[in-house]
């Protein structure tokens, strides 16, 4: 058994009928050459059956502790049914990009069956040009962006010939504990929880306005800042108590509306990594600076088209991995930064420089939070209280003002070509979730010389994800136009599902 962490549990607790914390990837496979096998549901199922022991997290299901006396556990599913988890369907003619995006939007809108392991794998046939899409859908409760990519290594090979994998060391399927056993475990852990809560309060309370998931709970900002001020007055806490809050004002936008549906829309685009690197090198900024600044330009142009651009800059939530090399695989080891997005800046070069400064300041604030505070926060609240507080925060987030306007996440993907069952992966698109209080989410995967972007919005959102994708392309061209070599982007291999150029 493996227990969920506080943040893992948060990902479960904040779910409701309209908000599901699910993510996915969409791998576009090249058409099979003559004589080469086509990737079908059966081919993929057989591949998973041979390799699933390499990803034990996929063999576990949830078991809750009665009365929420402790955080839930992952236990081996002795009845794991790959015929249930691996699925397939065919797109109708003509099988273009928009049909694929609609199908993926429908897939990520459907909730998981929580009595089974929280993942699904789909083979989508019928794409134009003979391509196939493989959709890997996962729940955020057991993976973050980095650990989700680790699970993909079960599917990925470095060559079309594949590889030999070691046999499982032990059989999967340990018996799940009974309800009474879980109750006894929860009761036995209460003294430990009390000790952790006391120690956690001393370490974490001054920094909760910078720590997930507490920073989104109403009132936390006031408590943390007051604690730091008091510590400074009495000379306690050292340099950490000099940490300032973001003091970012989140402007009202046309995106500010409560979630009314669980259904999502999704779109995707691909730009060349080398083009983003050219901008990075010319201006002496980071690749993430370029991605976020490009997104700022995209959101600005889209809001201008609607006549809804606020005078103040928008605020974006940027996840930051805190995973170390010796950390266990799986789970959520992530914190977040709040960053001012210079959507109020008309000039592209100035917008990039403002983004660089905003991200630099956010990183400095993030580094100022000691590791002891992060560890202390994990045990600050008793599980039953934490779960209720998380749910309350979700209900209030759409009513008392947003934490940020949008979410932008940048995740490094495979640096070289990978293959699934012998078929080369041409593009590797991400699918994020939409949370209460946020307009939309954008995730960027870097893969094999490209930046693959996915844009997710609620079905009834005024945001059109395809317009956002087009706006991102235009925004990157604006940055390229600032370079001495001119605006022409590098030649990008056609990897869109419908085989269209552009």
Question: What does each model-identified segment do?
Answer:
Residues 6-18:
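Acidic, low-complexity proline/glycine-rich segments
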Residues 1-9, 24-39, 43-438, 442-473, ...:
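Soluble acyl-CoA-dependent acyltransferase catalytic core bearing the H(X)4D motif
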Residues 20-22:
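Short, surface-exposed loop/turn motifs at beta-strand boundaries within globular domains
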């Amino acid at each position: 058994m493996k227990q969920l962490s506080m943040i893992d549990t948060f990902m479960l607790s904040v779910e409701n009928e309209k908000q599901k914390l699910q993510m996915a990837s969409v791998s576009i496979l090249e058409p099979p050459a003559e004589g080469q096998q086509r990737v079908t549901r059966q081919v993929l199922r057989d591949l998973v059956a041979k390799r699933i022991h390499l990803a034990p997290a996929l063999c576990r299901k949830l078991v809750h502790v009665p009365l929420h006396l402790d955080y839930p556990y992952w236990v081996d599913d002795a009845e794991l049914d790959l015929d249930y988890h691996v699925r397939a369907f065919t797109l109708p003619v003509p099988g273009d990009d928009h049909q694929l995006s609609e199908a993926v939007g429908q897939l990520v809108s459907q909730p998981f069956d929580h009595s089974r392991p929280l993942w699904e794998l789909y083979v989508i046939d019928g794409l134009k040009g003979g391509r196939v899409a493989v959709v890997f859908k996962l729940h955020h409760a057991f993976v973050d962006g980095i650990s989700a990519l680790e699970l993909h290594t079960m599917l990925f090979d470095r060559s079309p010939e594949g590889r030999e994998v070691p046999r499982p060391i032990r059989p999967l399927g340990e018996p799940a504990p009974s309800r009474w056993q879980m109750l006894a475990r929860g009761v036995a852990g209460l003294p430990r929880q009390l000790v952790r809560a006391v120690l956690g309060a001393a370490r974490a309370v001054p920094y909760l306005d910078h720590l997930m998931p507490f920073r989104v709970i109403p009132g936390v900002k006031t408590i943390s800042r007051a604690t730091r001020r008091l510590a400074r007055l009495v000379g306690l806490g050292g340099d950490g108590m000099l940490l300032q809050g973001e003091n970012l004002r989140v402007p009202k936008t046309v995106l500010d509306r409560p979630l009314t549906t669980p259904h999502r829309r999704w779109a995707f685009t691909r730009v060349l990594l080398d083009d983003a690197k050219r901008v990075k090198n010319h201006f002496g900024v980071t690749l993430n600076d370029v991605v976020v600044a490009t997104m700022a330009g995209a959101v600005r142009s889209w809001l201008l088209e609607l006549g809804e651009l606020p005078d103040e800059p928008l605020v974006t939530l940027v996840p930051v991995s805190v995973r170390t090399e010796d950390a266990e695989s799986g789970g959520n080891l992530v914190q977040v930064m709040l960053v001012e997005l210079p959507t109020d800046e008309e000039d592209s070069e100035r917008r990039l420089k403002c983004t660089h400064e905003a991200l630099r300041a956010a990183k400095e604030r993030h580094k100022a939070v000691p590791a002891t505070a992060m560890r202390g926060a994990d045990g600050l609240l008793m599980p039953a209280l934490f779960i209720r507080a998380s749910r309350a925060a979700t209900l209030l987030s759409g009513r008392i003002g947003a934490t940020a306007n949008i979410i932008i996440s940048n995740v490094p993907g495979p640096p070289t070509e990978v293959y699934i069952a012998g078929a080369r992966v041409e593009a590797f698109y991400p699918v994020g979730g939409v949370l209460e209080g946020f307009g939309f989410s954008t995730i960027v995967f870097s893969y094999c010389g490209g930046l693959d972007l996915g844009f997710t919005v609620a079905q009834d959102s005024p945001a059109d994800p395809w317009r956002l994708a087009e706006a991102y392309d235009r925004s990157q061209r604006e940055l390229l136009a600032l370079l001495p070599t001119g605006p022409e982007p590098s030649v990008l291999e056609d990897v869109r599902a419908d085989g269209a150029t552009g």
